Amino acid sequence: MSLQKKISQELHVQPSIDPKQEIEKRVGFLKDYLKKTGAKGFVLGISGGQDSTLAGRLAQLAASELRQEGKEDAVFIAVRLPHGVQQDEGDAQLALSFIQPDKSWKYDIAPAVTAFSEQYQKDTGGPLSDFNKGNVKARMRMIAQYAVGGEEGLLVIGTDHAAEAVTGFFTKYGDGGADVLPLTGLTKRQGRTLLEALQAPERLYLKKPTADLLDDKPQQTDETELGITYNEIDDYLEGKPVSEQAVEAIEKRYVQSEHKRQVPASMFDDWWK
């Protein structure tokens, strides 16, 4: 078996999907898992990008259906987590209008990130690099979501999907920290087809994806940082032909980021050997 096929199988990617069936399955999964855990509902940070828009809408559909089925306390809370002023705030508001969450809260992570960065420099004698400060931002968002989840009895939703998983393009214990992952197995383009089926505004899934974590490179696109396109990543995952350069880049990132897809290593594990 080729490494390409092995990776696709491990990440549960299907070469083609039926968007409406996928929506139904993923909403059903959220409902079933919520019932199993005994939690009241879900919480998710909404950025205005494709992934949080899709995961947020699926969560709201799940909460709404659960209430109709008799779980009266089922709720979805969307949380805006800007770092100061977000340049694409309009997209975030458009996403909220589409998702129609039961509740929408806002928590500005900038004061907490600034306080941490200043204390770090004071106690270590050196500043955080822009890259590591970006990871602090992602982890601060995780902290905020888990604070809401803990206080309200909610599960934290993660937005990880196959195109991010294969490249390790997420912050460990940041946006990678979650209780439940409704987008697992989807490529980036497959996620777009689900949003199309849900009649989301085109602007939310046609915009260039950006993690927007770096102060020095605001709104830098994911593809610029990765050095490969999502079309190349999706083609690879869906078993289609891709250039040797893209294959090498994707597989190198997959191997290097294996630790992100595993629980912390112990001497009893063999995945790291």
From Swiss-Prot:
Its EC number is 6.3.1.5. Gene3D superfamilies: HUPs (3.40.50.620). Pfam families: NAD_synthase. Coiled coil: none annotated. Keywords: ATP-binding, Ligase, Magnesium, Metal-binding, NAD, Nucleotide-binding. Deamido-NAD(+) binds at residues 139, 172, 179, 259-260. ATP binds at residues 45-52, 159, 188, 210. Mg(2+) binds at residues 51, 164. Belongs to the NAD synthetase family. Homodimer. This is NH(3)-dependent NAD(+) synthetase. It comes from Bacillus pumilus (strain SAFR-032). The lineage of its organism: Bacteria, Bacillati, Bacillota, Bacilli, Bacillales.
